[in-house]
Amino acid sequence: MTATDPVANLQTLIRCASVTPAEGGALTALADMLLPLGFKVERMTASEAGTPDIENLYARLGTEGPHLMFAGHTDVVPVGDAASWSHPPFAADIAGGELFGRGAVDMKGGIACFAAAVARHIEKHGPPAGSISFLITGDEEGPAINGTVKLLQWAAERGEQWDASLVGEPTNPDQLGDMIKIGRRGSISGFITVHGVQGHAAYPHLADNPVRSIVKLTEALLDPPFDAGTDNFQPSNLEVTTIDVGNAATNVIPAKATAAFNIRFNDTWTVETLRAEILARLDAAAADQTLRPGREPTKYDITWSDRPSQVFLTRNNALIASLSSAVENVTGHTPKLSTTGGTSDARFIKDYCPVVEFGLVGQTMHMVDERVAVADLETLTEIYETFIQRWFANAEL
């Protein structure tokens, strides 16, 4: 088979039911596209106690620098109610100019287009003056423990070094050419437990209601704002995601209350400085006796998620300029350079080389009837092909 057709590539990948953690044949299908192009393809299985084993793929064309890495994932989220789809989620049907299927935009479409772009570049110009690699995981939509982070470590231990990376996540809100991601906010999650004294609701003086205290502590995290934003990032934002007491009785004051929160933060902070700020706010609120006159300060515990992510911003001018000019050349749109949205595997790649993200329009990702315009697949392939040419030209300067 030839890999120059992004539509055929994507149909092949979608027909592999690779719902995390299942490989579903998707990495094998990708390998079949890359091997005829001259890539050396390797598979790596990552394991960790308490998590499913995950298959990953690393493929490289060339042995010299400069070295461009394309990164992404072939795993997809569950389809939900398959009967609600207008086309079977793994059939890759085309209707009304759109290709339907789970993973169409997130992100088998990006992989299909980059494979086609590389194939076209080789067909027209031969292999690039350097190296291109695919770093593809099967664990991005899941825990992300046995995926990109371990694949990077494995490859680096074998001597792999990269000069730049492009992640093919769907970055465009409305149309191709809208947005390139040049960084990501950091993320911290925490869990607060307030300890009270259980008692009868009619005799509050004999109890200590932790609900009042947990509300006060969470309010201290919400106001005042952590910052007003920076030149490249929107304001840091904390959301309380749950408050629980585990109490079904209306006449019982509970013994404890718990809350969870997540904060997406900008480059005003690091994980360490932000945790210190959160603790300072909680300590001040716990010591405030407004709601608990004459009592000891509120007793609380806090634990942190063991996998926070640091904020990062890519400042590699050659990488950003090569991609921006390629997008503008093909679409006529000047893309916005953005750091909005959630986290991605770029947070791991940033520790090895400069990284940017650009892919399809993300409006239907994770939804019933996930789909992509067939025309967008051709356009994205043209963007990627132009980017490859320009990046290697700029990297040689």
Swiss-Prot record:
Q: Which GO terms describe its biological process?
A: diaminopimelate biosynthetic process; L-arginine biosynthetic process; lysine biosynthetic process via diaminopimelate
| Keywords in alphabetical order | Amino-acid biosynthesis, Cobalt, Diaminopimelate biosynthesis, Hydrolase, Lysine biosynthesis, Metal-binding, Zinc
Cofactor needs: Zn(2+); Co(2+)
Which molecular function GO terms apply here?
A: acetylornithine deacetylase activity; cobalt ion binding; succinyl-diaminopimelate desuccinylase activity; zinc ion binding
Q: Which reaction does it catalyse?
A: N-succinyl-(2S,6S)-2,6-diaminopimelate + H2O = (2S,6S)-2,6-diaminopimelate + succinate
Q: Which residues of this protein are catalytic?
A: D75, E140 (proton acceptor)
Q: Record's Pfam families? A: M20_dimer (PF07687), Peptidase_M20 (PF01546)
EC assignment: 3.5.1.18
| Metal-binding is among the record's keywords | yes
Domain of life per record: Bacteria
Pathway involvement of the protein, from the record: Amino-acid biosynthesis; L-lysine biosynthesis via DAP pathway; LL-2,6-diaminopimelate from (S)-tetrahydrodipicolinate (succinylase route): step 3/3
EC main group:
hydrolase
UniProt cofactor note? Binds 2 Zn(2+) or Co(2+) ions per subunit.
- Cite the record's note on assembly: Homodimer.
Q: Please explain the role this protein plays, according to its UniProt record.
A: Catalyzes the hydrolysis of N-succinyl-L,L-diaminopimelic acid (SDAP), forming succinate and LL-2,6-diaminopimelate (DAP), an intermediate involved in the bacterial biosynthesis of lysine and meso-diaminopimelic acid, an essential component of bacterial cell walls.
Q: What HAMAP family does this protein map onto?
A: DapE
| Entry-linked NCBIfam families | dapE_proteo, PRK13009.1
User: What name does the UniProt record give this protein?
Assistant: Succinyl-diaminopimelate desuccinylase
Species of provenance: Rhizobium rhizogenes (strain K84 / ATCC BAA-868) (Agrobacterium radiobacter)
